[in-house]
Amino acid sequence: SVIAFGQTYNPSKESIKLSALQNLQTVAKNSLNELYIAQANYSNAVAARDKDFEPLTKLVTRIFNSLRASDSSEQTDKTVQTIVRKLQGRRASAKISEEDKKLLEEQGIEVNQISASQMSFDSRVENFGRLISLLSTIREYNPNEEELKLETLKELQTKLKQSNKEVVLASISLSNNRMNRNTILYSKISGLVDIAFDSKIYIKSVFGATSPQFKQVSRLYFKTRTV
């Protein structure tokens, strides 16, 4: 820490003066704390959404079987089955997170993510809504099971919409906090990393390249990143 250098550390450049460094340190720590909170909120929202959506595939199978067990026509069943199949679809490969995708791309690995069906959460909510709308027009669909009734399904649709919305909002917050962190740490000239380099150069000029003081700070490594 430059505090240990006392009055000997006395640069003329405003951005590397002790008070400026302390202020920047506080700002950087706050941005990191806010990012950690945003990451936790996003993870919690994703976990909650996964839990809410988990029973959907089995539920739509029950819905379809309930319809088939009624007096509905074969053509009606086929129309409903089209939507049901979309809700039951599977990915050709597991979906990776955007964070993992970026890390792979930084390593020069191109990531192709091909979906075999409409399994994004947005499309599942949309298709579930289409299924409910279609069922509401089918007079024969009148199950006695509470969890299969239209009103119950509509309540579930509202819950799924909200659950998905919470993830979207948490994702936006996470992205904004990550950009804020990157700006504070990696901006050219005004970012913490560039200012730290400037401070190290000043210490080198004051104490010398072979001095214990410079050796102490020269060991500190700062990774640069394009903002």
Q: Which ranges hold each PLM region?
A:
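Basic/polar low-complexity intrinsically disordered segments
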Residues: 1-227
